[in-house]
Amino acid sequence: MNFRLLSQYHADIKKLIKISLPILLAQIAQNSMGLADTIMAGRVSSTDMAAISIGASIWMPLMFFGQGLLLALPPTISYLNGSGQHHRIAHQVRQGIWLVLGVSIPLGLLIYFCEIPLQYMQMESKMSDLARDYLHAMLWGLPAYLMLINFRCLNDGIEKTKPAMVITFLGLLINIPLNYIFIYGKFGMPAFGAVGCGIATAIVNWAMCLMMIFYSYTNTQERSLKVFSQLIEMPNPKTLKKLLRLGLPIAIAICCEVALYALTSLMLSPLGATIVASHQITLNTSSFIFMFPMSIGMATTILVGQALGAGSPQNAKKIGYAALLLGLTVTIVTALITIFFRYEIASIFVTDEIVIAMAANLLLFAALYQFSDTIQMVVGGILRGYKDTKVILYITLFSYWVIGVPLGYTLGRTDWLVPHIDAKGFWIAFVVSLTFAAFLLSLRMKKMQAMNDNAILQRLEKLK
C-alpha cells in the first residue's frame, strides 16, 4: 500500500467515508426489510415465499427505474450548493415532486396490470394470485417511496446522508412488527400471508416518506432553502427536461443491469436446481458486496458536483482519484474475504455439499469481478457529478448486452468456443463485460478531466 498516496488524499477520503457510510448502512437496512419479508412469509408456506420472490422480480426493476430518474437531483443540487446558488435548490426539489407524480402513474399501471406477465410465467394459480395481490398491496406505497427518494436526494445533495440512514433503520423496526401483524393475523387482523408483507411495506413507505419530509421541514439548514415556502409550484418544462435528460439514462442503465442478472437466471434455469442455486448464492453475495462501491460512487457524485459548482475542476479531479483509491482499497479487503471464506459464505445459504462446492468455485470469479465493478461504479459516480450520464448508458448497453449476454450464453450454454461450462461461463462473461465497462468509463472520465477548466464550467452552466 502506498501510504504517501493515502496521505495525499487523506482529507478527501475522510469526507467520502463520512458521506458514504450512512448511505451504505441505509442500503443494508433497506435490504434487511426484503430479507425479513422473505423469512417471515416463508414460515407461512413455500408458496407465500415464492410469491414474494416473483412479485419482487416485477417490483424491483420498476422501482429502480423511478429511483434512477430521481438520481438526476443529487448532482444538480450538489452543484447548486457548491456554487452558492442555494435559492435555486428548492425549485429542483419541487420539480422533483412533479417527476414523482408523473412517473408514479405509468409505473402504477404496470404494477396494477401485473397479472398479464404473471400469466406467461407458467406457475400455479395460487402462487400467481398471491404475487398479484402482494403487488397490488405494494402499489399503495409506490408514490410514498418515490417521494421519499426525492427528499432523500435533497438531503444527499447538501451532504446530509445520515437522516436517510436513521429513517431507513426506523422503517426496518416498524416493518418487522407490521409483518408479524399482517402476515400471521395478530391483534384482530386477518392472516394475509405474503400479501401482508405488501401491506406492511406500503405502510412503512408512507411512514418513512413522512419522516423524511418532517425532517426536511424542521431542519434549520433546509428551512433556509425555503423548499416548503411555496405549497404549489407549477411544472416547469425546461427544468423537467433537464432533469429527465440527466435521469433517464441513469434509469435505463440501472434497468439494463437488473435485467442482465434476471435474464442470466432464466438462461441457467434449464440446467437444474443445483446450478441455479450455486449461481443465486454467488449473485446474492455479490449484491451485498456491491453496496460498498455503490455507496462510494453516490458519495463521489455529491462531492464532485459540489467541487464543480464551487468552480474547482481540479478539486473535482482530486476527489475522483481519492474515491477510486478508497473504493479499490475496500475491494481488496472484500475480495480477500470472498476468496478465503468462500466455503463458509456458501454454507450460510445451503447445507448441500455439491451446491456449496459449486458456489465456492463461482465466488472466485465474483472476487475478481469486484475490482471491475468498483471501478465502473466509482467512475460512473464521477461522471454523474459532471452530469455526463448519456455515455454511462451507451457504455452499459454495449458492455452488458453486446458483450456480456452473448458471451455468457456462448460459454455457459453452447459448445461453440469450448465445451459448455454452465454458470461459470456466465460469471466469466460478467468479469469480461464489467472490465470493458470500467475501461470505457475510465477513458470517458479522463477525457472529461482533460478538458480546459473554463470549458468544463461553461458546459455545466448550460446544464444547471
From Swiss-Prot:
Positions in coiled-coil regions = none
Q: Which UniProt keywords apply?
A: Antibiotic resistance, Antiport, Cell inner membrane, Cell membrane, Ion transport, Membrane, Sodium, Sodium transport, Transmembrane, Transmembrane helix, Transport
Q: What topology does the record note for this protein and the membrane?
A: Multi-pass membrane protein
The answer to whether UniProt assigns keyword Nucleus to this entry is no
The GO annotation for biological process reads: response to antibiotic; sodium ion transport
Record-linked Pfam families? MatE
Q: What sections of the protein cross the membrane? A: 16-36, 51-71, 96-116, 134-154, 164-184, 194-214, 248-268, 288-308, 321-341, 348-368, 391-411, 423-443
Q: Which GO terms describe its molecular function?
A: antiporter activity; xenobiotic transmembrane transporter activity
**GO CC annotation:** membrane; plasma membrane
Q: Where in the cell is it found?
A: Cell inner membrane
Domain of life, per UniProt, equals: Bacteria
Q: So what does this one do?
A: Multidrug efflux pump that functions as a Na(+)/drug antiporter. Confers resistance to norfloxacin, acriflavine, doxorubicin, ethidium bromide, tetraphenylphosphonium chloride, daunomycin, berberine and sodium deoxycholate.
What the record says about family reads:
Belongs to the multi antimicrobial extrusion (MATE) (TC 2.A.66.1) family.
Q: What is this protein called?
A: Multidrug resistance protein HmrM
Which species? Haemophilus influenzae (strain ATCC 51907 / DSM 11121 / KW20 / Rd)
